[in-house]
Amino acid sequence: MHKLLKLAAMGTAACALLAGMAPVANAQEKQNVEVLHWWTSGGEASALEVLKKDLESKGISWTDMPVAGGGGTEAMTVLRARVTAGNAPTAVQMLGFDIRDWAEQGALGNLDTVASKEGWEKVIPAPLQEFAKYDGHWIAAPVNIHSTNWMWINKAALDKAGGKEPTNWDELIALLDNFKAQGITPIAHGGQPWQDATIFDAVVLSFGPDFYKKAFIDLDPEALGSDTMKQAFDRMSKLRTYVDDNFSGRDWNLASAMVIEGKAGVQFMGDWAKGEFLKAGKKPGEDFVCMRYPGTQGAVTFNSDMFAMFKVSEDKVPAQLEMASAIESPAFQSAFNVVKGSAPARTDVPDTAFDACGKKAIADVKEANSKGTLLGSMAHGYANPAAVKNAIYDVVTRQFNGQLSSEDAVKELVAAVEAAK
């Protein structure tokens, strides 16, 4: 997501002296970045440390502004308050349409100098560029490509069930029934709207990337109101029967811990969940299995953490470009994403340092990018503006919690999206 650079205040006189005299290279000792983000879980914090250390090695100090909440909603609330008060952070982790909203307001800086010099356009996938650029100019530095259509399975529980990874809906249900028979919670889930929507993302994608695109990216009323969408809601109702009684409000990383500890069989979550497994000392293929949600093989729904750079005074621009360059360097892209659990935001980063899940993520992204099936995630702000996303959230969560039938959910979905456009 996105962060901005700011020279630390040294006192009015000292700052004036630096601004007047110090060229780019000599300003580094006094550079500071205040970073607003929501990377607060163990795995995420470890990944963030990679970025902190990388910037510190370049003479850029770090002022942390963590705001808990995996979907970033709370962080955006804090950001709006800061900007309204005329005190925007220098760097902000952002997703998709949130970036575009700030760009439309003329609030973001210009990274064209470094992007052009380093050839970002050739190595960053086009679907990411749609958000990292505005009006033809680079405004954000993509850090990674997270994909949301993953399953994280406890290996011991899977082995007890026969060891076969499910490849379709019927096999998934059979596996969940087996987990229930084993006496563990079949699905580890946190009852928060963005988590409900993350599952729905994968369920809808399992009906094919063309249907997903029509429904969630094109917002086609026929697709949104179709019998296929009703089937998707029916499947959500079925999956709801496999969560535990205490799921409401649970944070996503606590759901990951249930799978890690063998208390649950599977979690449907983006690949940031892998960071939790690694933090707990677990190994892919030995302790847990990573696989695409059944029926979504060959397609990837993504979100991308980006650092959006807000407009700063001219003397601070070099520091901003230094940070952007550091984020996009292949060495950093590899080191950071190995820890974060995501794929690099560049397609030319070697997979050498990545584990089996990381190698699969990189290969899947390349395949989807080449096939045109690398699609923005509805649940994570890369398919629709916030108003539409939140309207979908509301319907999905109410249906998942039994407040709407599938038939009524389809009708409400069409109406809610139309009203939010």
Curated annotation (Swiss-Prot):
A Pfam family matched in the record: SBP_bac_1
Question: What keywords sit in the KW lines?
Answer: Periplasm, Signal, Sugar transport, Transport
Q: Name one GO cellular component term.
A: periplasmic space
Principal localisation: periplasm
Secretion signal, residue range per the UniProt entry: 1-27
The UniProt entry, under SUPFAM superfamilies, shows: Periplasmic binding protein-like II (SSF53850)
Family statement drawn from the similarity comment of this UniProt entry:
Belongs to the bacterial solute-binding protein 1 family.
What's the further remark here? Immunogenic in cattle.
Protein's name according to its UniProt entry: Probable sugar-binding periplasmic protein
Organism classification: Bacteria, Pseudomonadati, Pseudomonadota, Alphaproteobacteria, Hyphomicrobiales
